[in-house]
């Protein structure tokens, strides 16, 4: 009996050992070795596409500035944290009769280079604008050339024409001469800044511009009060000249993408940073 019991014990022990060995083998096959490269899912071509805008900037205020906002009074590090884009004045138009604190006698803004460079190196997209004030078509074309020559090396995301006053009999023809010359020089993204009343009074056509920027202030108390009173589709709304943002101790013009528009789509349209010369 003892012998039979001993044999049974050996057989049972062998069976248990075999089962434990099999379990270890299965476990080894199930759990990857730490030295074995992990399998990764390859991203689709669409998800691999490099983001052409910073989504964090989309909801922030957009400012427009000139030489009247002195670089020495701006903390670019702080202000850059509070804006989604900047539109910098490059040319002040032919109305400059003498040099002043913000403008050279030739019409070029004294601070445009500094403004553009300081915001761009902080990854804030920059567009540019010129105040349109020539007295005839020939002068309009000359201003367009000066504007493009000064701005294009910085590859701005957009070129804007700021039209606020009547400086020639047919302002629509003058504005078109400026726009057409700018386009002929190589600018592809060209927008128009204009008040709705002036646009209607002087029959300024927006058809050939690729974006429209309209000022409507309401109470002009630093906050959004009212949308532009127009049936014309617009992209950007300048809603106050009394805005205040950390990084600059004086008032700023504040702008927002039209509330009726797709915010990200319009932001991408106006502030997509070009990696080639497609905007310039």
Language model segments and positions:
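Hydrophobic membrane-insertion alpha-helices, especially the h-region
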Residues: 1-14
């Amino acid at each position: 009996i003892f012998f039979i019991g001993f044999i049974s014990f050996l057989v049972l022990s062998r069976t248990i050992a075999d089962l434990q060995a099999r379990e270890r083998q299965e476990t080894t096959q199930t759990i990857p070795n730490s030295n074995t490269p992990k399998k990764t899912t390859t991203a689709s071509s669409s998800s691999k596409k490099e983001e052409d805008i910073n989504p964090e900037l989309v909801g922030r205020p957009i400012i427009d500035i000139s030489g009247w906002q002195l670089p020495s009074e701006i903390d670019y590090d702080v202000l850059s944290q509070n804006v989604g884009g900047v539109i910098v004045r490059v040319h002040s138009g032919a109305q400059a009769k003498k040099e002043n604190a913000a403008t050279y006698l030739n019409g070029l803004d004294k601070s445009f280079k500094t403004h553009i460079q300081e915001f761009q190196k902080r990854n804030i997209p920059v567009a540019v604008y010129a105040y349109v004030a020539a007295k005839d078509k020939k002068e309009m074309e000359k201003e367009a050339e000066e504007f493009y020559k000064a701005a294009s090396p910085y590859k701005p995301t957009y070129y804007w024409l700021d039209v606020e006053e009547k400086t020639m009999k047919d302002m629509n023809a003058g504005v078109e001469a400026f726009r057409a010359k700018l386009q002929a020089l190589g600018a592809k993204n060209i927008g128009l800044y204009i008040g709705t009343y002036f646009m209607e009074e002087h029959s300024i056509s927006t058809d050939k511009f690729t974006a429209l920027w309209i000022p409507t202030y309401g109470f002009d108390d630093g906050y959004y009060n009212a949308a532009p009173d127009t049936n014309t589709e617009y992209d950007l709304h300048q809603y106050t000249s009394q805005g205040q943002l950390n990084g600059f101790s004086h008032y700023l013009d504040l702008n927002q993408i039209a509330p009726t528009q797709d915010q990200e789509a319009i932001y991408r349209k106006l502030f997509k940073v070009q990696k080639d010369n497609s905007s310039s």
